[in-house]
From Swiss-Prot:
Source species, domain of life: Bacteria
Species in which this protein is naturally found: Prochlorococcus marinus subsp. pastoris (strain CCMP1986 / NIES-2087 / MED4)
Lineage summary: Bacteria, Bacillati, Cyanobacteriota, Cyanophyceae, Synechococcales
Protein name stated in the entry: N-acetyl-gamma-glutamyl-phosphate reductase
InterPro entries documented for this protein: AGPR_AS, AGPR_type-1, NAD(P)-bd_dom_sf, NAGSA_dehydrogenase, Semialdehyde_DH_NAD-bd
Entry-linked Pfam families: Semialdhyde_dh, Semialdhyde_dhC_1
Pathway the protein contributes to: Amino-acid biosynthesis; L-arginine biosynthesis; N(2)-acetyl-L-ornithine from L-glutamate: step 3/4
Amino acid sequence: MNVAIVGATGYGGIQAVNLLKSNKNYKISYLGGNKSSGTKWSDNFPFINLESDNLIEKISIDRIADKANVALLCLPNGISSTLTRGLLEKGVKVIDLSADYRYKSLDQWKNIYSNEAKKYKRDDDDLCKEAVYGLPEINFNDISKARLIASPGCYPTSALIPLNPFLSQGIIDNEGIVIDSKSGTSGGGREPNQKSLFSECGDGLSAYGLINHRHTSEIEQIASFISGNDIELLFTPHLIPMTRGMHSTIYGRLRDPGLTSSDCRIILENYYRNYSHIRVLPVDIYPSTKWVKNTNEIHLSVKVDTRNGRVIILSVIDNLIKGQTGQAIQNLNLISGLPINNGLEMINHYP
């Protein structure tokens, strides 16, 4: 399978090269970029060996179609929409790591991503409706048959996987869900940003995007799909001074206040028993982002507050792997008819 990595020098593209370069099932046949076009891979990343040392080409639909069966679009929001229809028409399957196709309505995307909507004049509501949300734990079968996959955001991944068993089976109320998440600075991408400068975020912890963070609506859309009911929740993200990693704490009210921590742990473990990358920890063992760094795993823990019938679910992921490119590779594996974790059996070099 020939794979194009478009946006190769961003964090998503770098992870894609690292994850695919030694995978015998795939060949990196095209690297695309704009600012970096005309340079070799080794010119940009001499510390990441790529045997073929591909030339990074100017992004071109025709060139991608000539050289690849599947395109991983590791691009800023809005840009993917300028390429996707042309690629699909030429028979290239698309896995988009941006938010361009995560919503089933183009109008909703335009409302949430209003700045990008002003810059990119889109008319592809049909593709928004066609795209499959690329969270394998929810859409496994649909992903395997799709030609356009919208890979989820990192925060939604860290929240929806732990919520899924409880919402889909009606174990928690649809109201009163609270998600408190903390992310490393790489979640903001590779472009310079004052907020992520070491002197700005080092030795500090800060919340941002309260109420109106873009991922709130993405989480609500999928949570509503899972539960079959409209869900409105509270989501508060925080920036923490580390490069990679994400920790989410999710609160919900149990419909059966008699459920214990052990009961809820069994619910999680049974639901995800066929997913080797999901590790449900024993009761009273709480996960650390260090445990999943540089892996595609998600670690979950659950605790019930019997005083008030609330459940607390903890999740940790590497925001650049399971929260981004590793998940895109899982989607690539599914559309290629391969095991979901092919090429993702990575070792965490603890500590």
